[in-house]
Amino acid sequence: MSNHSEAYGSRDQRREKYTQGKEFEDGTLETLESIISAVEDETLSKDYQPLIVFFQRGFGAQLVQTWSYYAQVNNHGKFSKTTSLLTKTLRVLSSDTSTVTIGSGLIRLILTDYTKVLYRGLNNMRAQLTNPILRLLKQIVNFNNGQHIEELVSYFDFSLPILPRLLVPSKSELANGNSSADSSKHDSLRFTFIKFWLTLISNASPFVRKELLTENFKIMSNLFKFMNKADSDKLSEHILSVFINDILKEKSFKRTTKTKILNELAASKIHHFYYSSNKNLVKKANEFFLTFGASRDFSVAFPDNCVWFKNSVADGASHGAPITVNQVEFQIHNKLLFNTLRLFKPWEDTLQLGTLIKILENVPELVAPYSIFLTTNGNYDPKMTSYWFGITLLINKIINLKIPQFMEKVDSNIPPATSLVIENILPSLLTKSSLVKSLQFETPIIRQLACQSIVLALKKLEKVSTFYDQKGWRNEKTILLNEFHTRIPDLPIFVSTLSNSLASNKDNRILPLSISIIFNYYSKMFPNLFSINLPSSNIYTDIMQKSKISGIEFAILDNYLQFQEFNSTQTRWWNPSSGGNSLFTLLLKLASSKNASNVITTRISNLLDELTRTNVIFNISLISPVMALVNSLQGLSLQVSEIDNMEQVWKWFDETISRVVKTPYKYVDMAKEYNYISPFIMCLSEQWKYVDKSGNPEFLIKWLILFLRNMIFIGEDHIGIDKLVKNVFPEVSDHDVNIYLKLDSFEENIKKTNSSNSLISSMKSSSFFQYISALPSKNLMNISRLPVNKLDAAGILFRVQLLVEDDSVVYDNWFEATACELTGKIASYMVTDTEFPIIKVLERYINFALPKLAIEKRNALLMKKSRFMCNLIGAVCFETGHQLVEFREIIQKVVFSGENVEEYANYNELYQKEDVNAFLTSVSEYLSTSALTSLLMCSTKLESTRNILQKLFNEGKTIKISLVKNILNKAANEDPASIKEVNISLAKFFEENKVCVDASSDPMGKLSLSETTSLINSFVSSDLNYLVLKAFYRWEHFSFPSFIPSIWRIKDSPLLSIVTTAALFKHMQDKDFSAFAHETISKYGNEIAKSTYTTSKSEIFDEILNMITTYIDFYDETKRNEILKCVLSQSDHKYHAATVRYIAAHNNFTYPGVETWLHKTLLYLTKYLSERKVISNSFFELLRAMAELLKLEEVPNKLNVKIINSQLEAILGSEWIKQIKVLEYVIVLIFCVSKKSIQSQRMVQLLLSNDSYSSIMIKDNDEDSSYRKFLSTMILFSLFSIDPVVNSTPIVQEKLLTFYSGTISSNDKLILKILETIESHTATSWTNMIFSWEFIKDEEEEILEAIGDTRLITKEREGLILTLQKNMIKKSIDRYVLERPQVPELYTDSNTNNYDATTRCDLVKKYYDDTERSGVDMYDPLFLLLLIIHNKELVKMVKDDEGNVTYRYEFENFLDCKIFQFIICSLSDCHTVANISYEHLSNLASSLEKKTAQMNLEKQITSKDNERKESDSDLIKYNSIYQVLIKRILYQRQQNQDPINPLIWFSISRIVDLLGSPTAPLHEKAYRWVLSNSTIRSWDIPMVSDVMMSYNKRQQDDNKKEIDMEIYYGELSWVLTTICKGIKTDEDYKMLEKKGVFEWLLNLINMPYLKERLRELIYFIFYKVQRVADDGGLNLISRNGIVSFFEVLNNNIKSRLPQDDILNNIGTLRNENRGTLNTTLRLAQEQNGIEKLLLGYNELVKSQKRLILWTEGDSDNVVKRLRK
């Protein structure tokens, strides 16, 4: 009370003070109130002038003072009234632009000086006072669209304890619940505060909103706590809308932020709204959960890289949170969502059911644990309850979920966990016993639903089984099938259910259909276990004996016939029943009836196709003959008057099918006379004479003609059909034969075919096949209908075939367009029917395209059209991805001789070579590599040669040198332009070393003498081959000794001799070459010197000049000057790269005209870069040459400053800075001139304001992006360093911060250097501008990949947002780089007047190369360690009672974000970094001690709470072990013991992870290691010795051998990973060698069951040793015999690999067996790794004379053996 009295005076004093000011203040308030009322009352034009005058006179301040005074003297009525008046005033002031400024001033006055008045009103906790304050705050938020929100957040303390209390409803409100009247709720403190709070977070910027919601968790907790008890429906809807729109759909909020705000409490309270009587609220709650869990864009679901795997396929670890459901353990990434799903009761309403299924579909990892969770609700024994029906629907929908997309995309040799997969197929709730009970339940609906669940499970099993086959998981598939089989009822149960169903209700067809489907799937999935014994009288025999069958009965038969294949007894579908038809005929009846839908017709046709395929009934070359038969019968069904006579047809079919199945080869022999048409047609013709033709046989003739016509269209021989009709069917008139069955005059007969009495005419509207068959050719381009079945597509193929074979149809644009249009319709159809056999027509077109020499006449038109069709078929196969392998195989089989097509196979001698070339060229886009290379060997057209070479190059294929020789020989007399294009392509193959030798005796693979001689003979065939020859000399297999005997063969070829002389300059010591070179340089040097070089030879001027430049020292001064004079006089070549190179080599800038030439050349460069949109290759060459010239010592003094600055402006302000060669030139240009000459400030501004530079730094992510970023930043660094004082501005600093990534990359180091310089000149730190921190966890990495790179620093309106990535910190630990190059000093005092551009360029290049070798994928340690002290979540500022400021390290946060591990790892760094790390460790130790002491004190106070006591004890123990570890590290430093190797520090950083994972197998060992000693020992690598010794111990224990070995492999994996990632220095290598680790690793490789991943780790350890150890690990060669060890290992792998080229046969392997492909690729990968190691050791051996002697010179033989 005393404090209160001192602050406000006594009661009497306050009353007196109030009385004195009452009259004035009341008058002021009344005046304002009247003004506000007047403004609000006016409807049209509002007069704000009185209000403006009121505030201009200073009454605004008095108003606020009065308001504050009322609060002080506790005049509640006046205080409340004044608060409301302030609210109205602000609302009015916000309504007009003329008064907004006044309102802003009033708000700032309240926030800066009177926030305590706001607090006082809130603390009163009375609706009369508090509600007006909340409404005032709400108005401040709304003022001018949220203009003052940030000021409100800054000045107003939202951590006030009173704010959460405002959200606690009174007892009366809780008693009334949601049923209380809205008016009463509007007066509640909770309602008013929520309205203010929702308005605030809705209008706040995302960053402010995030801070409000995350920092004020007590407010949010109280808001959630009473949502379902006290809030009205309308308010609840508003709350949910804000949650959805402003939290979940806020794009800047990461998932961690959303889960931190909307936690389990929120989800549990919101779920109650599903049971609200307000439908709108229910919909809004459902919308919330759909967004919360099912939205791919906005949900809180973290990406899961396991799904059906127990551990991540990326790193073999599980990063999920452990949960236990019904005693089953899971590791999941979305624990919040799982706990949310547990709230749902999907069996109660469909809304919850639909939402739950969508969440499971979005987060498939939750399916397995949720399926187990369902078992906690009780068993699944059948009951006629709503719960049972609801849970059945839920289970069925779970089973129906698709295979997760992650699983579809994953490529892993490790199979998924069967326990997880089976829950997705058959959830545990569906136990075998419960299913049996359901199948035997007395109520049919229960039995049906049980069958439905099993059917869905079997369908899912089939899909997953196929998926396993695609992934190559064959062994795990067997385990999965066995597990599924044990969970479903036995077959006799289903048979019994089927029998009981028929006995109780014969008319019930639904349950028998379900059981038939089960039998069908069962027979497919478990063929060896499928065997059922049906009673003699069963539903299947009953249906087959019926005269008519319904659609559902057909479905039953369909399934029955399919599973009969696997049953012991086969159904004789071809035999007619007594007094009835055969099943074959019955199905034809059903398919061809008027009432049959397209789906039924297609399904029956497919079924009959399957039945007839195993018998010799139709020719296999036909496309769906049964569908053609059905289509003809459908035509008869349209003839209503003839239906009564159909029995004749059905009997005819019965006899035909019965006989053709029983004696098929009889009819095959009969067909010989008729070009081997189908046996079915032959039997049909045989039975024709027995058909009853009494009455009206015309309809039979009509059908017969239609059927035979259909058969011709799908591939039956039309000549054989014509002959058969004439011999066997005399009733068919010649007129009908000519119209319907003759193809010679097809186009003429179409009009007659379309007559009104034709069956075809009547079928056109219902059958696409008949429509396309009767369409005139001119209308084929305008088809709007699409094929819907195989017969329709076959009809299209036949019409195309007619166009091809019709000689009256010329090959023109119309033909091409029509063929493309029709083939395109087939391609669109094949999207849905991948098995359509388009490939069947290919051979026919190939036969047309390749007439045989001895037999067939050449028809050029037919050949050309057929080649085009082959190309279209290849395009369809390629685009649809189906039958491409078959396409290639057919072509190779026909075209090439022999069964196996090897490279350069010979053509089939039956065909003309020119025809084969033309044919293969037409389909070259779709041929295999072997076929293409064979084509290149024989083809003569250079255009196709160029295209094929380009295709092979783009696909990364290699070609043989013999192919190059062949192409050069064939191109000798072709068009020069074509030759040049082909030569450019060939040169690329040489430059990329994609040309291999055919045969070589040289162990290093060099070209032999005979091969070189032969190739030189090909080169001299044309002078234009100089491009290939130039690349040939740089080829890795080029051998100078093999070449020199043939050198004089190129003497007479000017370009070839010039190129040879220039390229082989280094071989001038060879006598023969020296003589050749002197003759060449003398001849062409004299010609140029005398200016006698003719214009006709000007095309080789540049090559001559390049040669002269190379040999410039061989000319005297006079001759050089003569050549220079000639060069300067050549206007056509003055600005060529060759000219620049010669002038640079001549290096005489005092020669008349050279300086002028230099200025003009620079002007030419500026003009070119300013005007051109595209840069040519020749200009890039010019830039490169100019860059070399500018490095010369004399050049800087000759440069014109204005020209240089204008050129820099032209480049730095344009898009050319994206070109690496341009950037390299600019760097040289900057380095070669005086610092004072460049306008650095302008250039810096130009570069930083260039959008292209921003794009380079932020967006570029291609293979050259790193070098491009470095060059552009180096330019900026150089320009900045010219005048750092002037360039050190806040704008430059802010722009650079957005480009900085905080890594050790070369460009980041340059940016950091600039930032340090700016800070030193401005004396302000950029860290003061940090507004917020973001920390991205592992789970959000997938989002980053989707939205692109997340910058370390981003600029927002509020300030800088700094984002750290946990994954990046982990990478920084794993790839910690110790040797990091420093930024070179380019402008120091020592070289201020020394403009040696060459030295600077060399320094820059060396810096980049060294940095790239060290790796860039890690944070800069110094930057990160200094930055973390500014993060409040890591280091908090704490004030004690006396006001002293201390800093507390939040250890748990350090641990969680991996920075603690990073600190330990950085102890191996330089002294500066290590000292900072030790300082951090000291502070962490101090903070841990204080926290432990505080927890002990709290533990004593709250010891009565046993649960808390136990958890606190665990936490104390948890912190204590880290304290011990930190003290060990600090003690080691204190004792100044031996330095600790980086490998040990890295191992300790990994120990930290084990200490925090109690379930990890190595946790206990890690714990013991920490407690084992008081210091860190320089030779003690954690865990290594234990694991090395534990193998033998485990082998001795036979009882636990299997279990322990599995644990051992886990421990081994940890140790190998630690060594692999941690070995960084030669000291690490020596330490491992002393401990015998390498010998142990070699022994491990011989372990028979060592996992592939562990084997790869061992190989990589040796790979790193070769590069880390100072001597490369030579002792491993001499002491451990590692070379011979790996060579034996390599030979073993070779023997297990296929002999063919693996890369060129991947497609074949993939189609044959995915498992075989995976095995082969794994072996190939292992072999590749071993060969790399052997090549490395070979280089080490050759570097030591002692080892060369020790190995007796066998190193080259090792390489030779590898190349065999």
Curated annotation (Swiss-Prot):
Which InterPro entries does the record associate with it? Answer: NopRA1_C, Npa1_N, URB1
Which segments carry the region annotation Disordered? 1-23
Quote the Pfam families the UniProt record gives: NopRA1, Npa1
Instruction: Note the superkingdom of the native organism.
Output: Eukaryota
Any one GO molecular function term: mRNA binding
Which biological process terms from the Gene Ontology are attached to this UniProt entry?
maturation of 5.8S rRNA from tricistronic rRNA transcript (SSU-rRNA, 5.8S rRNA, LSU-rRNA); maturation of LSU-rRNA from tricistronic rRNA transcript (SSU-rRNA, 5.8S rRNA, LSU-rRNA); ribosomal large subunit biogenesis
Where do Basic and acidic residues bias regions lie?
Answer: 9-23
| Listed GO CC annotations | nucleolus; nucleus
Which of UniProt's keywords are assigned here? Nucleus, Ribosome biogenesis, rRNA processing
Q: Record keywords: rRNA processing included?
A: yes
Disulfide feature: none
Question: Where is the protein localized?
Answer: Nucleus, Nucleolus
Its UniProt miscellaneous note says: Present with 5890 molecules/cell in log phase SD medium.
Q: What is this protein's function per UniProt? A: Required for 60S ribosomal subunit formation and pre-rRNA processing. Required for normal accumulation of 25S and 5.8S rRNAs.
- Enumerate the PANTHER family for this protein: NUCLEOLAR PRE-RIBOSOMAL-ASSOCIATED PROTEIN 1 (PTHR13500:SF0), NUCLEOLAR PRERIBOSOMAL-ASSOCIATED PROTEIN 1 (PTHR13500)
Q: How does it assemble?
A: Associates with pre-60S ribosomal particles. Predominantly associated with the 27SA2 pre-rRNA. Can associate with a subset of box H/ACA and box C/D small nucleolar RNPs (snoRNPs) required for peptidyl transferase center modification and with small RNAs snR37 and snR42. Interacts with URB2. Together with DBP6, NOP8, URB2 and RSA3, forms an RNA-independent complex, which is required during early maturation of nascent 60S ribosomal subunits.
Name-wise, this protein is Nucleolar pre-ribosomal-associated protein 1
What is the organism of origin for this protein? Saccharomyces cerevisiae (strain ATCC 204508 / S288c) (Baker's yeast)
